[in-house]
């Protein structure tokens, strides 16, 4: 299946974010060179430590090579999944407001909107500010979707170049991994060509060798053959992700992209493929985005939307029958 592409005529992203990191002399840190952007700048592991256990004073992320198994980490208990906010600022406001109630907030792609009258470089500046707010409010990771692509990376394939600034600011993004307690979160980019696909395939193999008790992926497009990719007319999923799930069997994959799936009687916000739970909250109008709350301690996941709420047990062998229709 052909992957959705960036908008025709997309220009290379130019940084205008006013909150660049400042060096010790008070000077604005320059943009990374082109060769340091995209996949070349990826691959960090964020070990989020307990305050006072050797991390930052605020308990924020510290960078480490490998999986840092000797470090004491705080476990993930509650996860908030949202995706496809598409530059809907009231929905970003809501996410910032509720973020302190969660151990991890996952923005699973399509943060920008290529159909908006607001230029992508302006949108990216605003969304980067929201990521800074989310970082201050709690722990956040963000992966790219097809709407987030702003120009070619060092390999000449389309990439969300602007997200490199999120990483510099301490927000894990495309190509990074986060370790909290017994959980590893792998953040997957929206790949736009064979080199990107190959890089992700190789990375998942490397990450599998570091796999702890629980492995979670953030990946924008749901897998092919799943009700989480049903549009109401066709199965619109990612065949490559389906293969990777079958091969690696992560515990949870957090997706988006197909807005309609949870709102169709034969679609869903949740699916189980082997031992893997796949979630897609979908997209809705209004100031509160459709979202999925996952409580790992309670072993539950719940979908919240204008249509109502549905819940499942993570120990279930399959997703339950839909109840909002």
What are these regions (language model features)?
Residues 37-38, 42, 50, 65:
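Short Gly/Ser/Thr- and charged-rich N-terminal loops/segments
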Residues 78-86, 182-191, 216-220, 276-283, ...:
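Active-site-proximal beta-strand elements of phosphoester/diester hydrolases
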Residues 81-83, 105-110, 141-146, 172-173, ...:
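Active-site neighborhood of phospho(di)ester-bond hydrolases with catalytic His/Asp-centered motifs
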Residues 86-91, 112-116, 143-154, 193-195, ...:
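Active-site environment of divalent metal-dependent phosphoester hydrolases
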Residues 87-179:
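Core catalytic region of metal-dependent phosphoesterases/phosphodiesterases
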Residues 102, 241-245, 249-255:
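Proline-aspartate-enriched helix->loop->beta-strand connector
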Residues 148-240:
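Conserved catalytic scaffold of divalent metal-dependent phosphoesterases
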Residues 178-181, 242-247, 261-325:
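Binuclear metal-dependent phosphoesterase catalytic core
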């Amino acid at each position: 299946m052909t992957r959705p592409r960036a908008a025709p005529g997309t220009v290379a992203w130019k940084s205008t974010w006013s909150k660049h990191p400042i060096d010790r002399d008070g000077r604005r840190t320059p943009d990374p060179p082109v060769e340091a952007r995209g996949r070349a700048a990826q691959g960090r592991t964020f070990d989020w430590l307990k305050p006072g256990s050797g991390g930052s004073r605020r308990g924020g992320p510290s960078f480490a090579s490998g999986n840092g198994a000797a470090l004491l980490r705080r476990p993930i208990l509650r996860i908030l999944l949202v995706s496809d906010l598409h530059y809907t600022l009231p929905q970003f406001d809501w996410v910032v407001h509720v973020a302190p109630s969660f151990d991890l907030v996952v923005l699973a792609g399509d943060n920008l909107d290529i159909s908006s009258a607001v230029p992508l470089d302006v949108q990216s500046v605003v969304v980067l500010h929201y990521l800074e707010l989310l970082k201050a409010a709690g722990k956040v990771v963000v992966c790219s979707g097809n709407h987030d692509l702003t120009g070619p990376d060092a390999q000449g394939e389309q990439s969300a170049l602007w997200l490199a600034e999120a990483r510099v600011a301490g927000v894990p993004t495309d190509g990074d991994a986060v370790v909290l307690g017994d959980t590893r979160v792998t953040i997957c980019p929206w790949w736009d060509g064979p080199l990107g696909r190959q890089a992700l395939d190789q990375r998942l193999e490397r990450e599998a060798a570091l796999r702890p008790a629980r492995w979670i992926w953030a990946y924008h497009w749901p897998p092919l053959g799943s009700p989480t990719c049903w549009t109401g007319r066709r199965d619109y999923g990612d065949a490559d992700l389906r293969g990777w799930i079958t091969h690696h069997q992560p515990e949870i994959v957090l997706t988006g992209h197909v807005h309609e799936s949870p709102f169709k009687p034969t679609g869903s916000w949740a699916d189980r493929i082997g031992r893997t739970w796949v979630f897609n909250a979908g997209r809705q109008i209004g100031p509160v985005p459709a979202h999925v709350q996952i409580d790992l301690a309670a072993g539950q996941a719940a979908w919240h939307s204008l249509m109502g709420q549905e819940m499942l047990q993570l120990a279930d062998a399959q997703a339950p029958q839909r109840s909002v229709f």
